Amino acid sequence: MARNLCRNVQTTPRPLTALSLRRMVTPFHDLELQGSHCPRPRYFGSSTAKSAKKKSNNKAYSGSSMSAGDASAGPSRYPPLPEGWQAVIGIECHVQIKDKHKLFSTAELPTPSTPPNTLVTAFDAAHPGTLPTLNRSALRLAARTALSLNCQIHAESRFDRKHYFYSDLPAGYQITQKYMPLANNGQIKLLFDEGHLPSPEDEITVEIEQLQLEQDTAKSSYFDIGTTFRLDQASLADASNAEASPGAILHETDDDRVDRSFVDLNRAGAALMEIVSGPQMRTPEQAGAYVRKLQQLVRRIGASDGNMQEGSLRCDVNVSVNRIGEPFGTRCEVKNLNSVRFMMNAISFESHRQVKLLQQNGRVEQETRGYNESDGTTFRLRGKEDAPDYRYMPDPNLPPILLSEQQLHELRHGLPELPDARRARLVEQYGLSSRDINVLMRVGSEDERDGRIATQSLDTHAQQQTSSDAVDYFEQVATGRSAQTALNWIIHELMKGLNARNLPFKEWYLPAEYLGQLIDLVEDGQVTGTTAKTVIADLLSSAQSGHDGKTCLSLAAVRALAQSSSSPVFDLLKQRGLLALNTKKDLMPLVESAMERLPDEVAQVRKGNLKVAMRIVGQVMKDANGRANAKLVHQTILEQLGPTSAP
């Protein structure tokens, strides 16, 4: 009966207004929150979201970026444990699946700019009578992830209910996979050449104990005592009023000074993968390398964007210490770490804290701890005696997931080239160094800053291009060209320009075809390297600010020429008078002008001081705006000042 209900009943309610959502959910919380230590929830709108001050709590997720310096290999910056001691580290990663809809409802996933409580169905808000319908697309992405982790995918897996009460869980339980998960017994290899480990001796293989599907919770925001709010009366208009605000707009007030908790249900029910590692890691660097490689992998297969600063990838870390050769010690869990750097800091502090406690004849208690970002310390949240009894039980509204060998075969053959295989091929095919490969493969592993781009200034073609894979881009540019030359232009000019403008790596800023044409012009001597660098800077600036090409070079101008020309970059540079001056006839007016303005240098060159000729060359290059061939300019100057002076 339950199976038929799950397959036949579709939950397609329209998104709820703020008023109906409050009426629906508030009684549920009021029943339990009388006299409870849990903050009372409020459902809020976008104006409050912007002004909210987050409180450090084990249910609050805040974003943080990974700096480029964190990703560099080198000596460990974390102090080692005292001799004879070791840390044992396991990590639970919660990875939000990158799909259009949530795991069991038709609501779409929010973006960072989505107003609170506007992408919520009745099922997401736990309205009585609604039933779940499994998102098959999310299931496929989870299965692809399991295959890429070399996991064993079970032919049959089931969903369970994990019961606990908190304001960000309207139903009072989370749908997860406790007893029969989707997959287990996988592994990830951490290699020194990937650039995250201090030495080759740190290379390990980390086991993947389990990969399971589950729902995400709502997003909570917390306010300190002294910050209170009142509802705007306009937002309390009748729910049928089309002009009513989609979220309750709150304003600060001076009365009723209490702690407040505000809940945004947009994220509630989003599809998550919980990926549980084995306890093979021993150092913060190994833990950081593990999370970064997992992040790289889920991005490569399209399962998640893995942005820790936006909550798409969150980590809980289990840390214990013991003397080498003795049984593992009592573990402590550090919850909700939202950046790799914070996670590594937390592991280092927690392992040293436990060793110091044991050396002083103390006892490590099994407990859940939080991380203080301001001083890099961990703090107690609750002990084992306070841990909730989740009372897992099979979910009666969901049938088992059945996957055939044929389905798994199709998923396996649909996987893209995975990072390890890709790395090996780049070395063999192009002869790239590990350092160069790391630069290409790490593009996009830091902050994605798409939200900062003025997309209204980009043309339709640009908005349709969303590729951010630097390796694919490199291979397109390198086709028919020197791989090292292509790499140098990408890393030292294109990426440098993107970083200077605070832009993410997206191909449509400078399509590979156009960069390739520009490189060819430089190699053929038709454009100088100086001019080419200026061209790249102009193209990036035009893409960022929306120039139409009248005052500087623009991609729109290149694409317009591409409709009638096979070499639009050459044609545009020719139109703008930016081609190199490659003949003595073109250079003579500039050379003569420079010699007239530098008579002292001319006299010294004629006396045999040939080094001074470079001053004249510099003046010519300046007058030519970098378009002159410096070698030909030097030769022309020496010829003009007398054949006896020529080398």
Swiss-Prot record:
It is found in: Mitochondrion. Residues 39-77 are annotated as: Disordered. Allows the formation of correctly charged Gln-tRNA(Gln) through the transamidation of misacylated Glu-tRNA(Gln) in the mitochondria. The reaction takes place in the presence of glutamine and ATP through an activated gamma-phospho-Glu-tRNA(Gln). GO terms for cellular component: glutamyl-tRNA(Gln) amidotransferase complex; mitochondrion. Its EC number is 6.3.5.-. Residues 58-76 have a biased composition (Low complexity). Residues 1-16 form a transit peptide. SUPFAM superfamilies: GatB/YqeY motif (SSF89095), Glutamine synthetase/guanido kinase (SSF55931). Subunit of the heterotrimeric GatCAB amidotransferase (AdT) complex, composed of A, B and C subunits. Belongs to the GatB/GatE family. GatB subfamily. Disulfide bonds: none annotated. GO terms for molecular function: ATP binding; glutaminyl-tRNA synthase (glutamine-hydrolyzing) activity. It holds the Pfam family GatB_N. One of its GO terms (biological process) is mitochondrial translation. InterPro entries: Asn/Gln-tRNA_amidoTrfase_suB/E, Asn/Gln-tRNA_Trfase_suB/E_cat, Asn/Gln_amidotransferase, Asn/Gln_tRNA_amidoTrase-B-like, GatB, GatB_Yqey_C_2, Gln-tRNA_amidoTrfase_suB_CS, Gln_synth/guanido_kin_cat_dom. This is Glutamyl-tRNA(Gln) amidotransferase subunit B, mitochondrial. Keywords: ATP-binding, Ligase, Mitochondrion, Nucleotide-binding, Protein biosynthesis, Transit peptide. PANTHER family: GLUTAMYL-TRNA GLN AMIDOTRANSFERASE SUBUNIT B MITOCHONDRIAL AND PROKARYOTIC PET112-RELATED, GLUTAMYL-TRNA(GLN) AMIDOTRANSFERASE SUBUNIT B, MITOCHONDRIAL. It catalyses: L-glutamyl-tRNA(Gln) + L-glutamine + ATP + H2O = L-glutaminyl-tRNA(Gln) + L-glutamate + ADP + phosphate + H(+).
